[in-house]
Amino acid sequence: MASIIVRHNESFDDALRRFKRGVAKDGTLQEVRKREFYVKPSVARKLKSEAAQKRARKRARNDH
């Protein structure tokens, strides 16, 4: 979990911005969204395969 220490004369907005950056860097929100619902292993494999195919199509489209 990201944590920060508010610096002397640091505004709340600056501290909040640093905290948000730390949370994004840690991947905390991404992990929470991933674990929000249970996904069966077979469905997870299918989604992973579909995402890989989509990336491959996108990469092939961008490679000239």
UniProtKB/Swiss-Prot annotation:
TM regions (residue ranges): none
BP terms from Gene Ontology: translation
Any single Pfam family the record assigns to this protein: Ribosomal_S21
Gene Ontology cellular-component terms listed: ribonucleoprotein complex; ribosome
Keyword terms of this UniProt record: Ribonucleoprotein, Ribosomal protein
GO MF annotations, alphabetized: structural constituent of ribosome
The keyword Ribonucleoprotein belongs to this UniProt entry's keyword annotation: yes
Family indicated by similarity: Belongs to the bacterial ribosomal protein bS21 family.
PANTHER family tied to this protein: MITOCHONDRIAL 28S RIBOSOMAL PROTEIN S21, SMALL RIBOSOMAL SUBUNIT PROTEIN BS21
Designated name of the protein: Small ribosomal subunit protein bS21
Source organism per UniProt: Oenococcus oeni (strain ATCC BAA-331 / PSU-1)
Gene name linked to the record: rpsU
